Amino acid sequence: ALWMLPFNTRFQTSDNVYYNELQANGLYKFYEAFLKNELDYMQFYRTLPEDRAAALVHDEYRSEGQNHRYITSPNEERHPNIVLVTLESMSASFMARYGSSDGLTPRLDSLCGKALVFDRLFATGNRTVRGLEAVTLSLPPCPGQSIIKRPRNAGMHSTGAMLRDKGYDVLYFYGGNSYFDNMETFFGGNGYEIVDQKQYAPDEITFQNIWGVSDEDSYAKAIRTLGQRARSGRPFFAHIMSVSNHRPYTYPAGRIPIPNDAKSRAGGVMYSDYALGGFLDAASREPWFGNTVFVITADHCASSAGKTEIPLEKYHIPAMIYAPAFVAPGSVGKTASQIDLMPTLFSLLGMDY
C-alpha cells in the first residue's frame, strides 16, 4: 500500500496540531519523509521569474554604497567582562514572576529585582541549536537546518568574533561533549575556546549523567577558568550552556527538596535554578565580579507543542541583564527575541559593531 503515501496527506485536516502530528507519526509519513529528504525552498520563499531575479542581483552588485550596517554608539565604549548563560529548557512559565506558584525558581525570581528584565522575550525555536544560533549570530532562524549544524559555518560575524576583535578572550563552556549538535565545529571555527567535558580532570567531576557533568561542576569549572583569565588583564567573554534540566532529570543528591531519583521535570528546573544561584554567589566572591555583566536567558522552552501552530506561551523564555556596576535594574515590556539580546547589551555598553 506504499503507493498510497501521497494520498495519506489528506487526513491532516484537524485544527489541533497534536492530532495532525499523531496521525503523521507512522509508516506512511516515515517513508514519504525518507523519499523527500530535501529542503523544498518553494515552501519557504516567494520566488520571482529568473530574468527579474537576475536583474535585481545585477543591480545589487553594481551598488556603490555599503550593503551592511555599522552601528556606532554615541556613548563611551566600555569593555567589562561578559558572561552569557543559556539555561537548558527554561520556560518563563516556571517562574513566579510569570504566574507560577510552584516555587521552582527562587534564585531567578529574586534576581529579577536586581537586573534589567525583558518580560516579553521569545525563543526563535524549540531546539538548543536554534537558541545558540540566535544569541551567537543575532540572526532569525533560517529554513531547514540551523547554521550551527551546517557545513561551511566558520568565520562568521558572531558575538564572539566581534568581542575578540575588541581584545576579549572568548570561551564556550559546555558540560557535555561539544561534538553534540556540531557545537565543537561551529564554536571552534568561530574563534571560541571550547571548555567541555573532555577538559575536566576526574576530581573536577562530582556528578554526571548521559548529558554530561552537573551544572554545579560546569559552573565551578567556569569560576576556576575565568579567575585565571582575569589575572591576564584582558576582558573575557564566556558563554555557558547548562545541561542538567534535561531528561532524565538527574542531579546531585541533597541539593533541593525534590529527591534526585524522582527524575521529574520540576526537579530539573529547580536544580538548574539552584546551580545558577550557586554560580552567581561564587562569582560575587571573585575579584572580577564588579567588572562583569551577566546575561541570563534560555535556549528554548521545556516544550513547544500545543493546539495551535505556534503556541506563543511555549516560546516565552526568561531574559535579563545583571550588572550592578553597569546596568540599572528595571523591566522592558516590549516584545523581543533572542536575536535582540546581544545587540541590546552592546548598546548599553556603548559598543560599536
Regions found by a protein language model. Give the residues of each.
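Solvent-exposed soluble domains appended to multi-pass membrane proteins
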Residues: 58-353
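N-terminal secretory/membrane-targeting segments
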Residues: 1-80, 112
